[in-house]
Amino acid sequence: MSENAETFAFQAEIAQLMSLIINTFYSNKEIYLRELISNASDALDKIRYQALTEPSELDTGKELFIKITPNKEEKTLTIMDTGIGMTKADLVNNLGTIAKSGTKAFMEALQAGADISMIGQFGVGFYSAFLVADKVVVTSKNNDDDSYQWESSAGGSFVVRPYNDPELTRGTKITMYIKEDQVDFLEERKIKEIVKKHSQFIGYPIKLVVEKEREKEVEDEEAVESKDEEKKEGDVENVGEDADAEKDKKKTKKIKEKYFEDEELNKTKPIWTRNPDDISNEEYAEFYKSLSNDWEDHLAVKHFSVEGQLEFRALLFAPQRAPFDLFENKKSKNSIKLYVRRVFIMENCEELMPEYLNFIKGVVDSEDLPLNISREMLQQSKILKVIRKNLVKKCMELFDEIAEDKDNFKKFYEQFGKNLKLGIHEDSTNRKKLSEFLRYATSAGEEPTSLKEYVSRMKENQTQIYYITGESKEVVAASAFVERVKSRGFEVLYMCDPIDEYCVQQLKEYDGKKLVSVTKEGLELPETEEEKKKFEEDKVAYENLCKVIKDILEKKIEKVAVSNRLVSSPCCIVTSEYGWSANMERIMKAQALRDSSTMGYMAAKKHLEINPDHAIMKTLRERVEADKNDKTVKDLVVLLFETALLSSGFSLEEPQSHASRIYRMIKLGLDIGDEDIEESAVPSSCTAEAKIEGADEDASRMEEVD
C-alpha cells in the first residue's frame, strides 16, 4: 500500500446498503453494467457541457467514449470513460462518506420487496458493482486535480491513494474483481447481450475490447530440419547456385495468432434523435425489428419531436399484425420504451400510453424527466401526463395517415379494430376522433362503411343511425328486426363483434345523429299520417290479444305490444332501451366470472312485439275473441314466444319442453296417434312434459292455425 494511502469508513447507511447488496440473492445482477454505463454517460455529458463554454477542457482528450475490457485470466472487468472524472474529494464524498438522499429510501424500498434494478433511480447505482465483484478499484482523473485511486472490498472501509495511470488523461476507470460464481459476466457474448438490452442507445460509443484470431505465415522449422538431415546424407550440392531461389523455396506454415481490438457495440445511433427527412424506410424498418423482435416490417411510422416548455422526441410504429396474445391479462400493457436523455429507464411504461393502444411499439426520449425517476414517481408526474396526451394525439394522426390508403387501412382494421372500439369505450377525450375510424358491414352492400359515409347516404327524412348487433353478418342480415327498416329503404349497420356491444354503450351519437338499435323498444321510423293512423287502429284492435298473451306468459316478459318493425315474421322479442340486447345477454352468459345478480335484472326486461298484419296473429286474435278460454291458445302462445326468443337471438331456459312442443306439432301434422308416440324413441319424461291439455280434441283446430 502506498505511503500516502488514506483509509476511510463508509457512512453507516452506505455500509448497510452494501451489506444488503452483497448478502442478498438477486436474480437480475446484470443491471450493474447498465448502471455503470449510465454513470459513465452522465460524466461524458458533464464534460461535453463544460466544453461548450471552455473548449480547453477537452485538451486532455478530445474523444468521448466508454470502453469495457474483460480480462479472463485476472478475472477483472474494467469500464473506462473519458468523462469529467473525479477529484480526490469527489471520490471520498461520493463513493462512501456522504450518503445520497436516496440511500435510505432505496434500502427501505428493497426491504419492502422492490426490484434491485431500481438502484439507479435512487442515485446509488455505483454500488451495484458489488453484485458481481468482491473488490472494486476506481481510478479517476479530473482536470482540476491529480489522478487518485479508490479501492474497497466492502468491508466497512475504503482506501484512497494517489495513483498515476498513463492510459487515463481524464475520466474514470472502474475495475471490478469478479466473484468466482459470476465469471460468465466476463464472456464477450454476455456483455454484448446486456449492452444491447440496456444501453444500446447511449449517446457515446461503447467499445468492447474483444479477443480475435488471425492467420500468420511463419517459417516451418520442422521442414527446415528435415532438409538439413537430407543434406547430411551426402547429396551433392552446388553451393553457389541461385541462393535467392533457395530462399524462395523456404517452407512456411500458417499459424493462428490471438490479438485484441476495440469493437463498437452501439453503432446504431439513437434513430429518434436524427432528422426524419434523413432517415430511409429501410432504417426505420431495421430499427422497428430490433425494437419489437418482429420479423415483418412495420405498417406505418410516426416520428416527431415536441419543443417548448416540455421537450421530448418519440418514434411510434404500427405493426402489420396483432400478436396472438394482444389482450391477455398477463401481457404488459404496452410496448413503449422510456429513455431520459438517451439513457434507457424502463420498458413497457404503462403511464405513457392507454391500454387500448398497447399494440403501438416505440420509444420516447424525454429531456425533462429526472434520470432517477421511479415507477411511483411516474404515476404522479405531470410531465408524463403531458407526454401521454401528445402520444395519443399523434397516434390519431398516424391512424389518419393509414386511413388515406384504403387497402392499408383494411389490413390495419382487421388486426386492430378491437383496440379502436375498446378506445371508444375507455377514452372519452378521443371518442369522437376514434369513431371516425370505425368500419361496419351494412345492409346497403358488401363493402364495410364508415359512419361518415353512412351519414352521407342517409335519407332526407332519416334522423337516426340504425344498427343491429349479433353473432355474424348472416344472422343479423336475416333477422326479423331489420325487415321493416330495410323495406323502408333505410340502411342498417351490422355490428358482429362482441366488443361492439360495449362500444355502442358509450358511442351514443355520431355527427349529431343518435345511434339506435333496431332490437330495442322505442324504434321510431319516419311515418306518413296514414301509417300513423293505421298503427293506432292496430293497437286498439289487438289490445285484448296483447292482454291475453301477457297473462299466459306472466313474468317471462315485461309487456306485449303491437310492432311497427315486422314485415314477414309474426312476432319478435325486443329489450328495453337500457337493458341488454340478445347479443349482449349471450356474451354475458359466456363470462366465467359473471355476476348472477346483474344477469337477473339486466336480462329480465324483454318485450314481445306482435305483427298485426301477419296471418298467425290475425287468426289467433279471432280465436281469442271467439273463445277467451280456448285451450290451444295457451300452447300456441308459448310456442310462438319460444320461437321468437330463438329467432331474436336469445337462448331458451327449457329447451327440452320446447322440443316436446315441436314433437307434438309434428305428431299432429303427421296424424300420429298417442299409441304410436308411446312406442317412439322420445323418452317418457319428454312425452309427459309434452302432453298438452285438450290436445286431442283440438288437433284439427291447431292444424288450421298451422
From Swiss-Prot:
InterPro entries: HATPase_C_sf, HSP90_C, Hsp90_fam, Hsp90_N, Ribosomal_Su5_D2-typ_SF. ATP binds at residues 39, 81, 100, 126, 375. It comes from the Eukaryota. This is Heat shock protein 90. Residues 217-249, 679-706 are annotated as: Disordered. The gene is hsp-90. Residues 224-235, 690-706 have a biased composition (Basic and acidic residues). A motif (TPR repeat-binding) lies at residues 702-706. It is found in: Cytoplasm, Perinuclear region. The TPR repeat-binding motif mediates interaction with TPR repeat-containing proteins. The keyword Cell cycle applies. Molecular chaperone that promotes the maturation, structural maintenance and proper regulation of specific target proteins involved for instance in cell cycle control and signal transduction. Undergoes a functional cycle that is linked to its ATPase activity. This cycle probably induces conformational changes in the client proteins, thereby causing their activation. Interacts dynamically with various co-chaperones that modulate its substrate recognition, ATPase cycle and chaperone function. Belongs to the heat shock protein 90 family. The lineage of its organism: Eukaryota, Metazoa, Ecdysozoa, Nematoda, Chromadorea.
